[in-house]
């Protein structure tokens, strides 16, 4: 037994078999033992952290393999190896290697011991919510062995599936409505595409269909999101509707339900009929307020401004996209807020328990430019390759970016590149500018 504990050679080959996250190779520094005499400590050397996609398609499984070489204290155990899970710069949980299913092999050569670890850092054992984490691996107690810490990215995704807008087709005798319904937390309005038989009187048909509420399979708030609207008509890009006089029930009782009712009306009319203003009357007469005190003395504007399309998991395990309004005064602020939302699942410093991050922090926005209504966004990684066999998640990421970026003023089309190379994935070929999908979140 040596009297002193050495700074050791730590070769961490961290192989993440998280097939939906084949991240780029990262690096960390660690001290190296040099020469035949283990008492001779060399200067800090650079060692590679290898992150491999492997063959597993589970978004909740991460196999971490690493080797610790050095002179160990006889009391050393798996409890000394720690994992910090960091989100948004804060450590949300610290766990020990012994908290996970692991395998450990030991060997010794010339007085230097080696411990080979294989640890399953699975989401269930970690008891963490879906999202992007930075993983820190280290030994805190230097009396056991001195170990240089290492960092890498980890992305836990929900088990639910995403239905791509590309699955929606225009069919003879049918039409598609985009309808807005609150999620079960009343934090987001979720656009849902419903395919219905074609009819001539579209305006009344649209409002009645919205009032039917979402299908229970979508896992959203059930029932009608809006009060009964006895009269509605359209002239050009202006819609006028009349609410009944008197108590509107739940729509007059609380601010959340009332605000979501107003938003559901304006967004549904805008997305389906191109309505820019909505004039609200009471009993076909002008009034000052309605819906729990909302001002109706002037028409409501339907222009949305910049929005980040968040990824939500509903009560029934559906993964859906939902817009969150951003408070930004220029393109740079809006785009920065969008990518913060993509990486944290948080918009405007508000985090819904249904929302989750879908981009790891290692994916950087390298550059963007806007020209002739086209925005070109250059990323540090091909986002369609982050999720392995989970192509539904790749579609979700692409659709989130397309829907978000086209909410910017004077932006109609998008080009996505990875290190300057246009991204190509299934039906998406960004060698040419692409519009956002015509529909979103098919109702199934």
Q: Which residues fall in each region the model found?
A:
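Bimodal "functional hotspot" detector
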Residues: 2-444
């Amino acid at each position: 037994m040596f009297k002193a504990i050495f700074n050791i050679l730590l070769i961490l080959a961290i192989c993440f078999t998280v097939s939906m996250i084949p991240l780029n190779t990262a690096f960390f520094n660690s001290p190296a033992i040099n020469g035949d005499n283990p008492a001779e400590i060399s200067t800090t050397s650079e060692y590679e952290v290898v992150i491999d996609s492997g063959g597993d398609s589970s978004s909740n499984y991460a196999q971490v393999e690493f080797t610790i070489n050095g002179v160990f204290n006889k009391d050393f155990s798996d409890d000394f190896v720690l994992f910090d899970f960091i989100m948004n710069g804060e450590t949300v949980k610290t766990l020990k290697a012994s908290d996970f299913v692991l395998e450990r092999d030991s060997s010794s050569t010339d007085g230097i011991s080696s411990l080979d670890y294989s640890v399953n850092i699975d989401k269930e054992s970690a008891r963490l919510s879906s999202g992007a984490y930075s993983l820190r691996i280290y030994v805190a107690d230097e009396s056991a062995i001195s170990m240089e810490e290492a960092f890498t990215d980890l992305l836990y995704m929900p088990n639910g599936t995403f239905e791509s807008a590309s699955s929606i087709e225009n069919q003879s005798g049918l039409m598609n409505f985009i309808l807005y319904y609150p999620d079960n937390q009343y934090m987001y309005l979720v656009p849902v595409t419903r395919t219905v038989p074609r009819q001539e009187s579209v305006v009344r048909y649209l409002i009645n269909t919205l009032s039917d509420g979402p299908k229970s399979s979508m896992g959203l708030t059930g029932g009608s999101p809006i009060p009964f609207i006895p009269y509605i008509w359209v002239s050009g890009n202006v819609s006028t509707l009349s609410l009944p006089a008197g108590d509107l029930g739940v729509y007059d009782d609380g601010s959340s339900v009332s605000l979501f009712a107003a938003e559901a009306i304006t967004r549904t009319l805008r997305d389906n009929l191109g309505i820019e203003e909505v004039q609200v009357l009471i009993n076909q007469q002008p009034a000052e307020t309605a819906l729990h005190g909302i001002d109706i003395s002037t028409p409501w504007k339907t222009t949305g401004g910049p929005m980040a399309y968040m990824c939500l998991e509903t009560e029934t395990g559906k993964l859906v996209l939902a817009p969150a309004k951003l408070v930004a005064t220029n393109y740079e602020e809006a785009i920065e807020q969008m990518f913060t939302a993509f990486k944290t699942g948080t918009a405007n410093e508000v985090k819904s328990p249904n929302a989750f991050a879908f981009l790891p922090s290692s994916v950087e926005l390298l550059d963007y430019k806007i020209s002739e209504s086209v925005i070109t966004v250059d990323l540090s990684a091909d986002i369609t390759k982050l999720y392995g066999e989970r192509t539904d998640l790749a579609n979700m990421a692409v659709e989130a970016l397309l829907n978000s970026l086209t909410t910017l003023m004077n932006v109609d089309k998008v080009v996505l590149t990875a290190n300057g190379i246009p991204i190509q994935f299934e039906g998406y070929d960004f060698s040419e500018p692409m519009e956002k999908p015509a529909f979103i979140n098919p109702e199934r």
